A protein has these predicted regions:
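Short solvent-exposed beta->alpha transition segments
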Residues: 21-71, 75-78
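Short, flexible helix-adjacent loops and helix caps
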Residues: 13, 25-28, 84
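Exposed beta-sheet edge and beta->alpha loop/turn motif
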Residues: 67-121
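Glycine-centered loop/turn positions within well-structured domains
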Residues: 18, 26, 107
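Extracytoplasmic/periplasmic, Sec-exported soluble proteins
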Residues: 9-12, 31, 35, 90, ...
Length: 121
C-alpha cells in the first residue's frame, strides 16, 4: 500500500497528470460525487497554477474490510510555488486529511473514492 501512495506522490510532484490518473479507477467518486473526469480537470488546473509541488504524505491508518479493498486515512502536507511567483519566495502550504478507498485491480491498487476530512476529524 505504501508503494502505491509513494508512486502517486511521485507522479504529483512530477506534475504528470497521466501517471497520476493511472492510479484512479474509472468509477472513481469523490466526497462531492464528482468523477474521474472532474478530478483530472482539477489536477490539471492545480498543476498549471503551481509550477513546483512538494508533498509529504503520512498514512495514519489502513484497514482491509475485504481482501481486495483498502481504506486509508492519509495526511498530506502540500507545498507549492504558484506559476506567477516563479522568482518570489512566496510559497503556498496546506495540510489536508483524506479518507481514501482503494480497490485491487490485478496486481495494482486504484483509488475508487477520496474525500477530504476536517483536520483531526
Amino acid at each position: 500500500m505504501r508503494h502505491t501512495v509513494d508512486a502517486m506522490e511521485t507522479a504529483a510532484e512530477a506534475r504528470d497528470v497521466g501517471d497520476l490518473m493511472e492510479f484512479i479507477a474509472a468509477d472513481f467518486r469523490d466526497g462531492y460525487g464528482q468523477g474521474r473526469d472532474e478530478l483530472r480537470r482539477y489536477v490539471q488546473g492545480y498543476f498549471i497554477a503551481n509550477q513546483s509541488i512538494h508533498l509529504l504524505t503520512r498514512i495514519e491508518q489502513i484497514d482491509f474490510p475485504h481482501p481486495d479493498e483498502a481504506r486509508l486515512q492519509v495526511t498530506v502536507g502540500m507545498v507549492g510555488r504558484e506559476a506567477d511567483a516563479a522568482n518570489a519566495w512566496n510559497l503556498a502550504a496546506d495540510v489536508h486529511d483524506f479518507d481514501v478507498t482503494l480497490r485491487r485491480d490485478g496486481e495494482d491498487w486504484r483509488v475508487i473514492h477520496a474525500a477530504r476530512r476536517r483536520p483531526g476529524g
